[in-house]
Amino acid sequence: MPTVLIVDDAMFMRVALGNMLKEWGFEIVGEAANGKQAIEKYRELQPDLVTMDLTMPVMSGLDAVKEIIPEFPDAKIIMITALGQHRIIVDAIENGAKDFVTKPFTSENLKSVIDNVMRV
């Protein structure tokens, strides 16, 4: 069963993502509410997949990607972003994030992105 770390400052998003991912056969091994926690959890757990919100307090998802990828170049990180953050998303992809979804998104859209990232 593939493992996932869910990173989002909104508890309702972590719960919603967790429910979807469990339904698709993932094991939720950890959650984080900011980029700093995400780095710590990634180092500890080294999950198969990370869903990472872009805009969070303490440390952004982009800054977390910039710290995780040099240490773990094969990390599979999917960014979750609001509309209008495309320049930052390009920066995240250039720094090693594998793909992104834009809020609001459908479960089908998220599943398609996850399936593509997990195939690589």
Pin down the residues of each PLM region:
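Two-component/phosphorelay signaling modules centered on CheY-like receiver
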Residues: M11-G30
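Acidic catalytic/metal-coordinating carboxylates
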Residues: N34-Q37, S60-D63
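Active-site beta3 strand of CheY-like receiver
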Residues: L45-T51
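Receiver (REC) domain active-site loop signature in two-component systems and cognate sites
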Residues: M56
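Short, conserved "switch-loop" micro-motifs in signal-transduction and mechanochemical regulators
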Residues: L83-G84
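C-terminal output helix
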Residues: R87, F105-I114
